[in-house]
Amino acid sequence: MQRWWSVALCTLLVLVVVPAQAQEMPPLIETLSLVLPAVDAPPGDTPPGSWSGVLFYSDWETMLNVRGVSARPADFDELDTMPDEVSDLYSAATLFSLANTPALAELVVLDAGVTGFDLRSLGQIVVTGDPPDDALLIRGNFNLEAFIEARTAAGFVVERETRTSAWGGFGAAVLCSAEGCDQGRMIDPANRRVGDPLYGNLGQRSPIYAREDLVFATRDEIHFNRGVGVIEGERESLMDDPLFRTAAEAISADLTVMQAMFTFPRVIGAVSDSIAMANIGAPNLDALLAEAEATFTPIPAYEILAFGSGVRGEQVITQIVLVYRNSADAQNAGNIVAERIATAVSLSGNRPWAELLEDRSMILTAPAVFTSETTGLSAAVIEFTAPLPTTIRLAEESQDRPAPSDEGYLLLVRGLNMRDLGFLAISF
């Protein structure tokens, strides 16, 4: 009997001292932990070494996986040689679902011989800021030697290089143009390279930080050095900002995230701005503004705005996330925004938003409040749900091809670019 108790006690002690498995960090939060914090500044007024404006996040591998795409071509030229049903689904999951940014557009014509990597390397992609202060971060699997070889062949110089450490750290390289790391803004149209997302549209050659698991580039040297400091764990990241952290946690709480967008309220503008832009030169503009102002219901001022797109079960979920200091304001805002969406008219398309959602088989659900255990802040979460597309939805527009995965997300991003999201405006 005494021996039995001894064995039981030893077993109990073993159970007590075994640590719990650490919870895996969602890819969205893990990726944004490598991004420099943002500042809220109008275009042209961004402090040196900073970024402002909009952050776009896309998870290339997840976008393929949620549609069951098994093809992994090196580039879109190789994709064109595959059967139509394969290439069409791949394109629907990625190309036609991506938010429209210049860096991501270059992926369509990506040339591995120029870049040193191909589409099979891509994992998560982040584009931050307004040009010329924008930056690109790509996580994935890269052959560092091939990357360095391709860049040096293009006239880049290796400024710093470290090999993988004995304890498993990442080897890294810093590459700059022959003119120097401080010349990333230098315009050289004759040097523009189509198919290279790390080059500027006017031939600018950004300094580049490369490892086997990521590539980072931005034209501003101060921004570049600070961004490298974040990646190497020497500086605070965007996820140390409680506002952005709350938004990212709200999006990734129960979604397999495909894409996300983060920005400041000023980007939305006022309701009157949207109406004026949609009715330039209209003789009854004053009457339209007066009518809209009479029915305008204000919402509490939010701190951060985010859009999220992901999959939950067999549903594609599109989210609008508004971050607040307290849950009461978040609840109030969620209710008002949901009511606005139900009655709002898209000024660019002159159609009710309810019809635009219905066209895409999207349903507006009851708003919810998310409260972060990490930050203590809250967020209003407004969701649209739709079936995961497998066949045609808008045959006359898609030419009998599979529908994009992220139609709701693209609708919101398009509205953001066109100042057509008056239902999210704080002021008239």
Q: Could you say what each language-model-derived stretch is?
A:
Residues 1-4:
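Positively charged n-region of N-terminal signal peptides that target proteins for export
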Residues 7-16:
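Bacterial N-terminal signal peptides
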Residues 23-133, 139-428:
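Soluble, non-membrane globular domain cores that form compact, hydrophobic packing
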